[in-house]
Amino acid sequence: MSSLNKSIGSVTESPINVVVHNYDNNDPTETRHEVQTKHGKLVCFQKIGSNQSPNMPTIISYHDLGLNHTTCFSPFFNHPNMNHILPYLNIIHIEAPGHEFNAETIPSSQYPSITEMAEDIQYVLDYFKVKVFIGLGAGAGGCILTQYSIFYPRSVVGLVLVGSVIKSFSWLDWVKSWVELTTLPSLKNPTGVRKYLIDHYYADNLEETNPDLLEIIKKEMVLINPDNLYHYVHSFVKRDDIKEEQIKALGCKILLVVGKDSTYKEDIIDLFSQFNPRNSTILQVPDCGILVTAEKPGDIVEPFKLFMQGIGFLLDYYQSHDDAQK
């Protein structure tokens, strides 16, 4: 088991530029797909690298609460230091149910649980004819991808979990969150749901370190159907516990990423201790909260590249990139 503490922590990130969009997809390089699953429709966005290699690795991302794939992952994938490897990747972003722009409200009785969302990933793989993939999950999205990897271990060769607390809440935390959540008037006052998310997940760090990014998250959150946003939070709070023996049994390579200023840092470090020490690594990013992919994307680009190389991908990239440098 290894731990990476950022040696480039003194490097200052340039301001994050996340385009707040008011239409379905603002990236012309992404293609929108609708996948029918057992529990309803999933909207996915695919970005295929220009290399077109038959061995091109597939990255499947799943975003955190209150976000969509644009807010959560575009600062990372659009970072200048990622330009050299994007041609070598097949990226599929899964939007949580009903989190695409202009989505219809999903009735609470039909909104899937975290376990059901994990099961529905198999429909995405079948649709895109993907056999194996590397999962990139932020927060709740990491829980979903981890649960899927327990169900279908042969399909997952690597997991990058960013700020993800996999274990369910303790009884006391569950009651506290449940009381707070059930008092939110989701239908009459959608701002209550958004305020809950901002206060509990992002404001503690971003108000001081990156207020512009916090404003972007708030504006983007308004574009998500408020009832579906509430349902996603509700499913996360009520998620089934993943047992310690299930976590230890994970056979894929795992990179756990946590911001050192995150409220949940200790929980994530405790989670790291439960992974198999032979295939897990933790990366602690200084001066950063829970949303590392947006706050400090440049700090995780190189560890991500090395992680991919360690599981046998991007070897052509390294060879060609080294040749170009020479």
Swiss-Prot record:
It holds the Pfam family Ndr. InterPro entries: AB_hydrolase_fold, NDRG. It comes from Dictyostelium discoideum (Social amoeba). Belongs to the NDRG family. This is NDRG-like protein.
